[in-house]
Amino acid sequence: MTSKYDALLHNQSTNTNPFSKLQDRSSLLGEKFTKVLVANRSEIAIRVFRTAHELSMHTVAIYSYEDRLSMHRQKADESYPIGKVGQYSPVGAYLAIDEIVSIAKRTGANLVHPGYGFLSENAEFARKVNEAGMQFVGPSPEVIDSLGDKTKARAIAIRCGVPVVPGTPGPVEHYEEAEAFVKEYGLPVIIKAAMGGGGRGMRVVRSADTLKESFERARSEALASFGDGTVFIERFLDKPKHIEIQLMADKAGNVIHLHERDCSVQRRHQKVVEIAPAKDLDPKIRQALYDDAIKIAKEVKYCNAGTAEFLLDQKGRHYFIEINPRIQVEHTITEEITGVDIVSAQLHVAAGFTLPEIGLTQDKISTRGFAIQCRVTTEDPNNGFAPDIGKIEVYRSAGGNGVRLDGANGFAGSVITPHYDSMLVKCTCHDATYEYTRRKMIRSLIEFRVRGVKTNIPFVLRLLMHDTFIQGNCWTTFIDDTPELFQLYRSRNRAQKLLAYLGDLAVNGSSIKGQNGEPALKSEIVMPVLLDSTGNQIDVSHPSEKGWRKLLLDNGPAAFAKAVRNHKRGLIMDTTWRDAHQSLLATRVRTIDLVNIAPYTSHALASAYSLEMWGGATFDVSMRFLHECPWDRLRRLRKLVPNIPFQMLLRGANGLCYSSLPDNVIYFFCEQAKKNGIDIFRVFDALNDVNNLSLGIDAAKRAGGVVEATMCYSGDMLNPKKKYNLDYYVNLVDKMVEMGIHILGIKDMAGVMKPKAARLLISAIREKHPELPIHVHTHDSAGTAVASMAAALEAGADVVDVATDSMSGLTSQPSFGAVLASVDGTDKQLEFDNNQLREIDSYWAQMRLLYSPFESEIKGTDSDVYNHEIPGGQLTNLKFQATSLGLGTQWAETKKAYIEANKLLGDIIKVTPTSKVVGDLAQFMVQNKLSAEDVENRATTLDFPASVLDFFQGLMGQPYGGFPEPLRTNVLKGRRQPLTDRPGKFLPAADFDAIRKLLSEKFGVSSDCDIAAYTQFPGVFEEYRQFVDRYGDLTTVPTKFFLSRPEMNEEMHVEIDQGKTLIVKFVALGPLNPRTGQREVYFELNGENRHVTVEDKKAAIETVTRPRADPGNPGHVAAPMSGTIVEIRVKEGAKVKKGDIIAVLSAMKMEIVISAPHSGVLKSLAVVQGDSVNGGDLCAVLEHE
């Protein structure tokens, strides 16, 4: 310390208040400089306040009306509004020179620090501050005049012999001058604002067609940002580096440098990531840059902090760009590597200290390690970096050794407006080497949690991990030249998304379709305890090693089928994981409850032929209503139960759908199903159409699966008057055997196969095909399924279907325990431990209570099924649908209409999707009070359900015996052309590459399984992904909390990953905001307070929102981001060409054009000048000419 500085320290006054002791001392800058006003906002204002407080100075903040809640106002000792409410625009307030000078004078400020941006390079402001008797913290007004104007700075550099980029000799006032320069020097060129920085007022022009528009936009943006629309033009260098030298000078003429920064990583001329010092810069070039920077500073008698900026071309030649006569955003990295507090030096120099007096001489300035600064902003990289606005719901920052944060409005509850720069915080990391620093920055950015607004963190992480950045070889257009940078890492945001779902549940209740009330189960679920034959408890943390699947994997499908046929005892397939809950609980059982019982099932059911657990309705219901990924369910269960074969239901050429799909979709789907864990494909066709069956059989076979070709059983085979007799079924089996199937399935979906019929049919097939394994499936709607399955086993069937007792009976499968008892002591005795089955069943008894909101109203068996033949799964759904349509009191009429509809359609096989056709027609008849005769007589004029039209057209295949005429012709008349062959033949092959591209653009990287799901259910898949984007993956949320409104102060434990559990407590529900129709919902998350804003769907909303543009409507023109409409270019009714500018939007001090997406006529404008809009709001409607 010098003697002058020591004297100040020794003259400090004493104050007994420890909290004000630091500031109650005299300022370290002397008695003349005790108070500083910062003529700026946000982060840089707080940065100056902090150093000023360390120097025992008092601080003054100023703020606009829009900034009245900004953090910088609270960090100062005093804060004052700029003008009256409405007097200035949000930006204009910080450009109000006279008002700011008046506040500074009135509050007794001695120093005025301009920060960066706004008035920091305005000579008039500096002059007025000095004239008012205060000291401007920065260069003199004359120096600002000479260097702040880039055209004057160029002239100075040329005078000093410092190389500059070829450009206009002075400011360009008129477009004609710009045009003349381009003609002389060629393209590309860059148009730059003469004043200011930060990339604003800059436009690169590569085409003569865009020169005029770019010129006008640069001038307009410069005027809006800096109060001066002057611009100049330079040649644009290709792929240069941007190197800047930090300068510090005093009034005595001392000038030093604080080494360099590499600011090459930019987007639209705005710096994104800065590095100090520059990596691998040639020492000779580095020294030349230092020398030239100091040369210019001395030439103009520079004082205070400043930055000399240079471009370095690919041949190592450097060109002077400008000197920024102010502190820079990125000054932090220089402070980190040099240990110099630049703001402190600024204040000292402004107070009259020389650099040597504060210990700053060139020989004492050295660098230590590397520093990197990243700007965390609320910009959305997926939307052209449009700034996002809204309330920050969660804010958690990084920390640790070598991590520095400079921020302001980054806190939970902060409202990000469209009025100012989008930066939340500057994260600066410092370490011994460039690579250590880079890794530290990555770690720090990953630690950040910002929810409620989008941020650029995913983009910056992608940038930091790019090879070019790792090598330190970036150039100024690197971001624009590297499209792979926009393949972003998606933040999962799991906790906040979970709270959003629970908040919606608290306000609006469950949104799961078909739910009636809340679960009856209120207690904790009790898990089974399995004991082995010796009474010891089985360790279920490891799956059983017993089971049929090992034989299948080791020897293949043919050997597996042979082993099944040679097995002397009976085998079962358990349907609890699919058809049972489809029949009883509307297919609503969730993955988590299957996962919980899976380890126990692996042991207790190790002897099972298979578990039916996938395909059919479970696939689309899991996405559509449970918001789960069916592929994830398959993979998770496969991992837990590797020993028992998994079986799925495949609707032949329909895949999982109700109508035919392109052939390549079926093959692709089966391939993915086999890869992810399916072993046995139970392939059927709803009409027993062998053409449709053959495709599914071939697809399953090519995928490497066990082909269980299945014929659908319907009617009463014992009645000679019925259409489907014994000969029909045996002939059908013959055709399937010829296709090379492994196993025969018989699917009695309505449960109408009587025990005698089972004996007769199985015996006939067994006699003709003694080596063919037979598997029989039924439903217990009539109450005779146990007897039928026992009869089937007795007659020679190898496998029958059962469901655990608590999930059996009625429209489900027969009881496991009852079938087990029925064949006990016979040759077909089943090999299971009764005690273990009871333990498994006790779990499912609890599940029945947990899913009680989805129970059907069917309370007993219905022998009338032998008449109406409604399939078990449909019987439940049809009654629910009838009630939904207001036909609940006409259930008997609906069943009667089902019989009539079936006859009208030609007495068809009834299984999804043909059963839906019969059901739709039946409800149509009841709703419209139509008899069968009415349907026949009025067929040409009735508006039939779409499924009925699909059936008669032939989209579901060809029914046995053909279509009923003339009904078919009359139904289709003037509507559709009938098909006479397999529908899939007429469908074009799916373009998987195009689908992958589409899904990747919409939802990020997409897998083969995503494509397979999309090709089956495109709309359902998109809705599912949109739900997950909004609420996250909810599969691990316990079902009790998934279906029920959260209880106040009840703890919810949700394991979102291995070893990572969220503890959530619902603590309060806020009042309704009548203006927005929303409520605040408050939670504790792992002990921290969190809240979410939820729309109350029952509330009336007072406000009227702007219409939103429909992304699927090519005529809708949307606002690309939030901001204010500053200019309307065309009138309604005008003709426009593609790319013509319709309006200009101003946001975050940037101007963005809204252009026509195609040529046409402007039908209407939805905005006027001055309107505030959000991104995606409708601005205009175009019509094609």
Curated annotation (Swiss-Prot):
| Annotated GO CC locations | cytosol
EC annotation from Swiss-Prot or TrEMBL? 6.4.1.1
Residues with PTM N6-carboxylysine: 747
Required co-factor(s) are: biotin; Zn(2+)
Record: active site: 326
* Pathways per UniProt: Carbohydrate biosynthesis; gluconeogenesis
Q: Which residues carry this modification: N6-biotinyllysine?
A: 1149
Tell me which domain of life the UniProt entry assigns to the organism this sequence originates from.
Eukaryota
Q: Where is the Pyruvate carboxyltransferase domain?
A: 570-838
Report the record's Gene Ontology biological process terms: generation of precursor metabolites and energy; gluconeogenesis; pyruvate metabolic process
Q: Which Pfam families match?
A: Biotin_carb_C, Biotin_carb_N, Biotin_lipoyl, CPSase_L_D2, HMGL-like, PYC_OADA
> Which GO molecular function, any one, fits this protein according to its record?
ATP binding
Name of the protein in its database record: Pyruvate carboxylase
- Organism equals Schizosaccharomyces pombe (strain 972 / ATCC 24843)
Instruction: Supply the source organism's classification.
Output: Eukaryota, Fungi, Dikarya, Ascomycota, Taphrinomycotina
